[in-house]
Amino acid sequence: MQIAIIAAGCFWGVQEVYLRKFIPAAAILKTSVGYTGGITADPTYKEVCTNTTNHAEALKIEFDEKLTSYDKIIEFFFAMHDPTTSNQQGNDIGTQYRSAIFTTNPEQATIAKRVMNEVQAKHYPNKKIVTQILPAGKWWDAEDYHQLYLEKNPDGYRCSSHFLRWNVFE
């Protein structure tokens, strides 16, 4: 089992896209939404939304490395959101919506940088990817009502930028 931590806008949609579109689905063992990358301890959603904590809305993915790779998790990340917008995904604006990869070890950082460079060359030759690649810091799970939010609220808000831009699994 390995952990990936990513931020790509509203965490509800990021979680939903990974759970519904990632192949093989069995590779995703567990997901949780939460906050990381900020300066305050144990932040609340309300605090994060003030743009004063510097936390990102993020997704923690526990995955089976026998069924998929960190490379594939990261390529999927770049395919499912717009990594060229700073602190914004669709209509969601603020530092909590930034594009970021929070790496748990040096190997993940190397892979994330390599995949980002490959995606930049292949899919965004005329736009600069602004995704931050940072060492993972403290993680705080978001409040319970945020966990699997769109599964519990099928008509809930979905960010317009959360869709697959290319087939990662060809």
From Swiss-Prot:
Q: Which Gene Ontology cellular component terms are annotated?
A: cytoplasm; cytosol; nucleus
Protein's recorded name? Probable peptide methionine sulfoxide reductase
Q: Does the keyword ATP-binding apply?
A: no
**Does this UniProt record's set of keywords contain Cytoplasm?**
yes
Q: Which PANTHER family match?
A: PEPTIDE METHIONINE SULFOXIDE REDUCTASE (PTHR43774), PEPTIDE METHIONINE SULFOXIDE REDUCTASE MSRA 2 (PTHR43774:SF1)
Q: Which organism is it from?
A: Schizosaccharomyces pombe (strain 972 / ATCC 24843) (Fission yeast)
Q: Which UniProt keywords apply?
A: Cytoplasm, Nucleus, Oxidoreductase
Give the function comment from the record.
Has an important function as a repair enzyme for proteins that have been inactivated by oxidation. Catalyzes the reversible oxidation-reduction of methionine sulfoxide in proteins to methionine.
Family affiliation:
Belongs to the MsrA Met sulfoxide reductase family.
Q: Name one GO biological process term.
A: cellular response to oxidative stress
The protein's gene is named mxr1
Q: Which GO terms describe its molecular function?
A: L-methionine-(S)-S-oxide reductase activity; peptide-methionine (S)-S-oxide reductase activity
Q: What SUPFAM superfamilies does this protein map onto?
A: Peptide methionine sulfoxide reductase
